[in-house]
Amino acid sequence: GTEVLTSYGATESLPVTMLGSREILRETRRITDQGGGVCVGRSAPGMHIRVVPIHEEPIESWSEDLTLPQGEIGEIVVRGPVVTPSYYNRPQATKLAKIPTENGDVWHRMGDVGYFDAQGRLWMCGRKGHRIEAETGTLYTIPCEAVFDTHPAVRRSALVSVDGAGARDDTGEGENPPPGHATPVLCVERLKGSSIEDQRLTEELLEIARSYEHTSVITTVLYHPSFPVDIRHNAKIFREKLAIWAGKRLESQQSSDS
C-alpha cells in the first residue's frame, strides 16, 4: 500500500519531524488512544530537537544541561536550517521564543510540550499554554482528550479550566491560578446522529476518566454544540473562548441548583 508521511512543525520551523502512516497505524495510534500523546516522529534531516523544563520567562542562553531525560514531559525546542532567527520588529516576542547559542545560532521554543520515547521518537502532548495545574499535578491536553475521543459518541473534546489555566493564549501569556487550584473541565462536542442521552454519556465518560491515572481528577463534563475553531483549519480549537463559556455554564448551573 501507499505510505503517507506526516510532518510536525510551525510557521517558524517546518518540517521538524516526519512519521509514516504505517508506523502510526501499526503502533503509535494505540498508544495515543491510551493517553500517550501524539507521536510526531523522528527529526527531519538537519534538525535538532530537545525537551527542556517548562518556563514562562525568556531563557537567556542555551546549555545542553537544560535537556530533560527521555520520557519526561517538557517544552519542545528546535534548531536547524529552517528555523527563523527572529520576529520582524518584535524584540520581546523574539526574546521569549528564541534561545541564543554561543555561535550566534538560536533554538526556537515551539510552544508545545512533549517527550522522547526509547526509540528517539518525539511525542506531542499539547500547547504549553493549555496545560492545567490541577490538584493531582499537571494535566496536558492531548493525553487527556485522546482517551475520551475514543468514545463512539464523541466527535472531539477539549480540556479547559474555569479558573484561568487552559485559557492562556498560544504564547503562554496570561494569568494562572496558584498551582494545584485549577479545576479541569472536559468540554465535549458530540458526534451528530448519536442517540445516547447526555446523562448516560457523562457516566460513561467519567468511567473512562477513572480508568486512567492522568484523567482521574476530571469530574466535570459539559456539552457544547459546536466548538469555536479557527476557520482556516477546523482542528484548532479556541480554548480561551471555550473556557469562558464553560465558566459561565457552570455558574448558571450552580445558580439553578441553589
Predicted regions and their residues:
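AMP-binding/adenylate-forming catalytic core of the ANL superfamily
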Residues: G80, P85-S86, K95-L96, D105-V106, ...
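Conserved AMP-binding/adenylate-forming
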Residues: G1-S7, T11-R121, K128-R131
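Short, solvent-exposed polar/charged micro-motifs at secondary-structure junctions
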Residues: P15-T17, E60-W62, A167-P177, P228-N234
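Short, internal active-site loops enriched in acidic
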Residues: H55-E57, D163-G166, L191, P225-V229
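Short linear motifs in exposed loops
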Residues: M47, C125-G126, I142, R232, ...
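A structural micro-motif
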Residues: T2, M47, V154-R155, S216-T219
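Conserved C-terminal "lid"/linker of ANL adenylate-forming enzymes
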Residues: A158-S161, L186, L206-S258
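A short, structural micro-pattern
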Residues: S43, Q70, G180-A182, T215, ...
